[in-house]
């Protein structure tokens, strides 16, 4: 079997918001890579076996004392090195060049003039055939003097060194961000570094990843049974499909129907996995328990804890009926792993602690099976399609773990959940019919616990309000509200008010993130 981890790239993270995007772009090329904090134990670099090293951007300044630096082992390794933004600045500063703070930060589009055609830039031109690239800049400092042995390969009208290289050492640096789509030929530059300069084979494909994970899972669990909490979300669905292919009937899924899922989602999950794919699924209808526990609770965090703790309790009860289960499968993905690892100095970014690990009782004493822990979300989706899951399921918009419990403001009641699920289904149905669903990042309805006066027929009505939310985003860290057509919003509003008894008003949320969050609670 092909070893898909033989050719790989190491990315040292200096805290940039785009670091994970660098890794995703390299994976798209077909090469495995990992992200390590810049202050990771340098003695492990040689043992990792990378064919090249990328130094990411970051928010710090190389002109200040104590700024993050690349380990000397990077330069002693003999490997190709590619510094991006801050990565190029520390490359220059550490190797005998100089950096300085700019009079004004440069953020946004820029034109870079190629003045020396090295292995990165040879033959690249703009649409008019000139040796010029449209790129995305985001920096405050810049390289003012290149180190000995380096050549300036690109410049702009604002900074003297937009790119540099030492081709003898195979060390390269660019001040701009090739990983973002605004840099029109950025993927070409990354491919040239990873494939042409580092010599990596493009073995990281969905089909190869599936074969690799099937072999790993079989080796890990042997003849033991595995249990999986199936939620209907993308990650757990792909884990279920992958493990079913790997170990067949040795997998048992536990699907907890909380009463807080999307409209008819429980039936859809059972139809897909139990009936269509033949996966063993235990369906637990727990809506009564959830609504009883949530009665009188309005605080969002309290609701989240109740919903999460009750899931653990129910999952624990069901797992006790599966005496032969020795392993617990989880949908941990690579960003969770990165966020948990963090930086030992605290200078690299740490976003949150990992939300899967530690969520189940200690006494369960089950080994962990995490077949997606090397993958980004977009890779998980591609695996899902390769495994035969419906595209409509694999590319569904994100849905919060607590479900409708955090889309019903205030106290959660069964009647509110049923009303909201139907309103949400109407919104999503109309988005699909208008060919808008795949053009936005996330859309959903929210139940507001306030009543508004309306007129139904000739009678006065005093009924509930539904809010609609749709956003466009790249990373969900920031988001813009989606500018949906007025006629479309009118159609959705009319359907919700006409088809659902108890709703008299529909409003549209036009808040960005920040200052608002995407979810209302």
UniProtKB/Swiss-Prot annotation:
Pfam families: GATase, GMP_synt_C, NAD_synthase. Its EC number is 6.3.5.2. Residues 204-396 form the GMPS ATP-PPase domain. GO terms for molecular function: ATP binding; GMP synthase activity. It catalyses: XMP + L-glutamine + ATP + H2O = GMP + L-glutamate + AMP + diphosphate + 2 H(+). It is an enzyme of class 6 (ligase). InterPro entries: Class_I_gatase-like, GATASE, GMP_synth_C, GMP_synth_GATase, GMP_synthase, GMPS_ATP_PPase_dom, NAD/GMP_synthase, Rossmann-like_a/b/a_fold. One of its GO terms (cellular component) is cytosol. ATP binds at residues 231-237. The keyword Glycoprotein does not apply. Pathway: Purine metabolism; GMP biosynthesis; GMP from XMP (L-Gln route): step 1/1. The active site is at 85 (nucleophile), 177, 179. Residues 8-203 form the Glutamine amidotransferase type-1 domain. Keywords: ATP-binding, Glutamine amidotransferase, GMP biosynthesis, Ligase, Nucleotide-binding, Purine biosynthesis. Homodimer. Catalyzes the synthesis of GMP from XMP. HAMAP family: GMP_synthase. This is GMP synthase [glutamine-hydrolyzing]. It comes from Xanthomonas oryzae pv. oryzae (strain KACC10331 / KXO85).
